Design a protein with these regions (language model features):
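C-terminal catalytic domain of Rieske-type non-heme iron oxygenases
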Residues: 1-209
Length: 209
C-alpha cells in the first residue's frame, strides 16, 4: 500500500503537520541497548512514563501527567498512534507534584542555561510533546522546538540500537536553529554520561527487568 493508505486518515495529518515544508538534517545520536526493542517502542506510547522517569520534563513543565493531552490510534490496523500534551497557561500543576512528593519534580533545580526552555511558536496548536509512533519501529517527535525521527533497530531478541535523527526546517532563522541544536547537544551529553537533568533513561530502564 501507499504510505497514506498504510497510515490511514487519522495518522497522516500528524505526519503532514511536521513535514509541511523542506527540512534540514542537524545530526544524529546512537545508543545501544540490552533489552527487547518492543519494550522501548511500547514505552514511548505510554503517556505516564515521562513524568515517572524524566526529572527534566517534569520539573520544567515540558511534560506532566496532569496536562491536557490526547491519545489517538489509527483506524485501520490499530498499530500506529499519536500522543500529545499541551500545557495550559493558567495551570499550576507543580503544586500537585510537591504535595505527593513525586521524585521527578525538584523545585530547587535550576538550569545553567535557562534559554533551553524558550519556546518558539511554530504550529497552530503548540504542543509541548508530540510523539508519533509508526509501526513497526519509527517514532517521530516534536518536543517544544526539537524535532527528530527515532529509529528502533533490533539486533537480537535482547538487544537493539536507538538512533535519533534531528532536523529543523530549511528556513529556520539563526535563533531558532541555535535553540534546536541545544537539545541535540543535550542528548549527546546524556549519552556520554555528563551531568544532565534526568533521573532515568528510558532505554536503560527497559533492560532492568
Amino acid at each position: 500500500p501507499s504510505l497514506a493508505d498504510y497510515l490511514g486518515p487519522r495518522m497522516l495529518p500528524w505526519l503532514d503537520r511536521i513535514f509541511h515544508k523542506p527540512v534540514e538534517y542537524l545530526g544524529c545520536t546512537r545508543q545501544y541497548a540490552k533489552s527487547n526493542w518492543k519494550l522501548y517502542y511500547e514505552n514511548v506510547k505510554d503517556p505516564y512514563h515521562a513524568s515517572l522517569l524524566h526529572l527534566f520534563h517534569t520539573t520544567f513543565n515540558i511534560y506532566r501527567s496532569n496536562m491536557r493531552g490526547r491519545s489517538v490510534m489509527d483506524d485501520g490496523l490499530g498499530v500506529h498512534s499519536i500522543i500529545t500534551t499541551t500545557p495550559q497557561e493558567d495551570d499550576d500543576t507543580a503544586g500537585d507534584y510537591q504535595k505527593h512528593d513525586i521524585a521527578t519534580y525538584r523545585a530547587g533545580l535550576k538550569l545553567a542555561d535557562p534559554s533551553m526552555l524558550e519556546v518558539r511558536r511554530e504550529f497552530e496548536e503548540q504542543t509541548s510533546n508530540n510523539i508519533h509512533t509508526l509501526f513497526p519501529s519509527t517514532v517521530i517527535q516534536q518536543i517544544h522546538n526539537t524535532m527528530a525521527v527515532r529509529q528502533v533497530l533490533p539486533k537480537s531478541a535482547g538487544e537493539f540500537e536507538l538512533v535519533f535523527h534531528f532536523f529543523g526546517y530549511q528556513d529556520d532563522d539563526v535563533a531558532l536553529r541555535r535553540l534546536r541544536l541545544k537539545f541535540v547537544e543535550q542528548r549527546r551529553a546524556h549519552l556520554h554520561r555528563q551531568p544532565v537533568a534526568g533521573v532515568a533513561d528510558t532505554v536503560v530502564a527497559g533492560g532492568l527487568g
